[in-house]
């Protein structure tokens, strides 16, 4: 153990090589202690689509805080890392890279294209692991998993087959969300709805007998070639006599029937609705009720097919313009009604999705959802933090639709279904025997395999595997509220179905990282922050402190460099007080310090400030542990900050100088012991949040790694309310004198008279017993503490519990000079107020300047006014004193 830290805190030096050393020492693996209670977390697997962003840094920091604390508390901890193949997202990235060279996946073919995707995966998996290391994540790499690993693939096949056998996976032709760019189906929750400028196109469909026209309206006229009927409400007197007759479909000039169906709302539009069963989910249901043909008029890539006649091969949106023009030419266009409406867009490619009839594989959700809902009323329920997200989960499960799980991609788990020439389907974990079978080319939705993550990573379907028996169900899941539907809910219902248990006991839901203005970080806004850039400037510990200290379950966090500066300053403060303690340590060991601290707690040694700091340390340990248990890391961080900076550094360390600068060697040893012991406990409390710097400092005072050191526990023998109250009263006196000096601009170096009039005999005795502390911090020329102290006429006074503090003004200032100074200061702020007031009264400025600029001026005005008002009050007080 070296007893010296470098003079200046340098995070790059502190963090360099430390992570690799931890890995070499195997400190992140489970302890293997069968007597210890297990605590496990599976990392939400990041997509191998690219580098991790600030949201990932937040998510993994919270997990690392939990697992590091539990490890120190003696739990047998497992934090299992891994990554997700992220089917559509990764395939889109690789296709984009190939497109830069003018190559498509079809040019390469499936096998060679997948080779390229695996190369991409290896490249970005290495990058992600490097980022994990920079963040200091204490994961067990010996158990690292990937969603396309053979073990996980086996689990995927088994789940698919079992659900198929139960009739809960089925294949059918239904309207689904189609992504024309990725050329694949999407589930409902992979579709993001955006308000876009569009139009209602009103068209006339002439009755076959030519007697009249029926007006219909659509936002997608390009689908009209798939119209197989128009519908009217059977109770609509305007049209019910027309049911059973035909209208002529414009452009194609073919007859289609008029059907009576309650889907047509007499109160909406004209009450006549065009029915396109292959391109609209509601029309599909109408078509089923009336046995209408299903006509698909688009290709996989969003171009029109041969059924669109002269528009064959045109992109759907180009076709829209051309069709509207044609309708106008033939006199079938009534009007174009501009409007804003909600249009579904692919979450991954960003293009508008196309509702489209397609043959896909689905998971039947009824019973799975019922099981998940019912489980929340049992002892095996999942606890959400904050609890309001339990309602979010239940609401979604109660309204869930069947889940389309097939994707027309190449990257992913190929569906374990085979077909032969006779039209037979074989579903199994292994390929069927014999010739003539061809496997379904589609792959499964990424979320299908991700839903099995908590138990497939533990060895399932081998329920006898050691990890599955020991660490499943997992203890806690940490994730963002944006994927409760995508992932959390699916893990719950799949785990209940296949293991009979919930996948995790707790779910900690966090929000999103936003910029300083509260905007979501995005490429389009250019406001994204690379966590590695932040680490390079401030260090991982500072970033982790910011992410945890601003964290409240379920709430968003605003990133700012000002807060990062504050984080770095806090760590620098810890570094400096650690150096002070070590420089004054005089060879004291932690074991000896513990023995001496025990004597202080027993009242056999030390002074009241020693007992006070141990009492407050004890309270801090208790409160931090309580808040960690509730995942209130932000609250815990504030408690730690206040204790370390305010109570320990600003007060206790300063108070110890009264002893350390004395000649009493016995008292010095006790004080050094309390300093060293408290520092040790602070480092242990901070370690889950700041692993690097705490390990560096801990190495100066103890053997071994802090990673596996014992986490602090509150000790009853440290409780000392009397010492706590006494020192708080001392602090009140010192603060009162300091504040009075500051009010009248009297330097701390100037000796003054201080009179303390007590009304409590115990407090009187306490102040007199500890008068040296008051003298050290207040610099009195004369100090008197008594119940009958004489108070002169002109004084500054303040009141604390049990005493009044008086400072004779004659010692403090020349009142006339102070009044002159205050009048000058008042004029200065009046000038500032006039300037900002003039700017804000300028209507052109307020109307044309950016809102944040205007707000900044208003904030200035408020600040200046507060300063002006405070000086006015001070002048009034001074004038009263003169009288």
UniProtKB/Swiss-Prot annotation:
* One function term, GO molecular function aspect: ATP binding
Position of sequence motif 'HIGH' region: 46-56
What highest taxon heads this organism's lineage? Bacteria
Query: What's its catalytic activity?
Result: tRNA(Val) + L-valine + ATP = L-valyl-tRNA(Val) + AMP + diphosphate
According to its UniProt entry, the function of this protein is described as:
Catalyzes the attachment of valine to tRNA(Val). As ValRS can inadvertently accommodate and process structurally similar amino acids such as threonine, to avoid such errors, it has a 'posttransfer' editing activity that hydrolyzes mischarged Thr-tRNA(Val) in a tRNA-dependent manner.
PANTHER family named among the record's database cross-references: VALINE--TRNA LIGASE, CHLOROPLASTIC_MITOCHONDRIAL 2, VALYL-TRNA SYNTHETASES
Residues annotated as binding ATP are 523
Q: InterPro entries given for it?
A: aa-tRNA-synth_I_CS, aa-tRNA-synth_Ia, Anticodon_Ia_Val, M/V/L/I-tRNA-synth_anticd-bd, Rossmann-like_a/b/a_fold, tRNA-bd_arm, tRNAsynth_Ia_anticodon-bd, Val-tRNA_synth_C_sf
Alphabetized, the UniProt keywords read: Aminoacyl-tRNA synthetase, ATP-binding, Coiled coil, Cytoplasm, Ligase, Nucleotide-binding, Protein biosynthesis
Q: Where is this motif: 'KMSKS' region?
A: 520-524
Question: Under which name does UniProt file this protein?
Answer: Valine--tRNA ligase
Question: What is the protein's major site of localization?
Answer: cytoplasm
- Subunit notes for this chain? Monomer.
Q: Which GO terms describe its cellular component?
A: cytosol
**Which EC numbers characterise this protein's activity in its record?**
6.1.1.9
Entry's NCBIfam families?
Answer: PRK05729.1, valS
**What's an example GO BP annotation here?**
valyl-tRNA aminoacylation
Where does the record place it?
A: Cytoplasm
State the domain notes: ValRS has two distinct active sites: one for aminoacylation and one for editing. The misactivated threonine is translocated from the active site to the editing site. The C-terminal coiled-coil domain is crucial for aminoacylation activity.
Q: Which Pfam families match?
A: Anticodon_1 (PF08264), tRNA-synt_1 (PF00133), Val_tRNA-synt_C (PF10458)
Residue ranges annotated as coiled coil are: 809-844
